A protein has these predicted regions:
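Conserved ABC ATPase "signature" C-loop
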Residues: 152-153, 168
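ABC nucleotide-binding domain "signature motif"
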Residues: 10-20, 155
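Conserved H-loop
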Residues: 136-142
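ABC ATPase "signature
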Residues: 158-159
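Conserved ABC ATPase "signature" region
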Residues: 21, 41, 53-70, 87-89
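Conserved catalytic segment of ABC-fold P-loop ATPases
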Residues: 142-149
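A short, proline-enriched helix->beta-strand linker immediately N-terminal to the Walker B motif
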Residues: 92-101
Length: 182
């Protein structure tokens, strides 16, 4: 939330360079009374894109979201999966420099999740910085090169994603009283 500037730091300052697109929570940034179409343009405007730029990206957004005629229905009528589809499509089609995905892919069906992971990989390959927040260690291992484990708001470990995931798993098992051989 600090990087996305939806929350102010209690002390110090944060400097962010580039366009930040953030999937922080389901429906964040959407006006539920607006249609999906209206929300696409609203989201683009919030991210600093002109209406002309959003018109040129609209077909890509709707094709990726794959919600059909629901694009012209109020977002409040959407299922959580439909809302996530549209939010993900908008945020990944606006050429972000930094993309924040905070547990947002936990909704939606498996084929769409797979489509999202392919899109994330494409964005990473294009040089987009991805800040991916998840408790799904398999996904962290497959998408992230580096990982940060926070415990009580403080850095517990920072390093290669596979090493951090392994240490976190070991910690979780030990918390449950299970000892693992290393």
């Amino acid at each position: 939330q600090l990087i996305a500037k939806t929350l102010q730091p209690s002390s110090g300052s944060i400097e962010v360079h580039g366009r930040v697109a953030a999937l922080l929570e389901l429906g964040a940034g959407f006006n539920i009374d607006f249609t999906g179409r209206e929300n696409v343009f609203l989201s683009g405007a919030i991210l600093g894109l002109s209406q002309k730029e959003m018109v040129s990206r609209f077909d890509e957004v709707t094709a990726f979201a794959d919600i059909g005629d629901f694009i012209d229905q109020p977002v409040k009528t959407y299922s959580s999966g439909m809302m996530m589809r549209l939010a993900f499509a908008v945020n990944t089609c606006v050429d972000p420099d930094i993309l924040i995905v905070d547990e947002a892919l936990s909704v939606g069906d498996a084929p769409f999740q797979s489509k999202c992971f392919r899109r994330l990989r494409q964005l990473i390959d294009q040089g987009v910085s991805l800040l991916f927040v998840s408790h799904d260690l398999g996904t962290v291992r497959s998408i992230c090169s580096r990982a940060l484990w926070l415990k009580d708001g403080k850095t517990e470990m920072w390093g290669e994603a596979k090493d951090v995931a392994r240490a976190y798993e070991k910690y979780c098992w030990q918390e449950q009283g299970v000892t693992l051989e290393t």
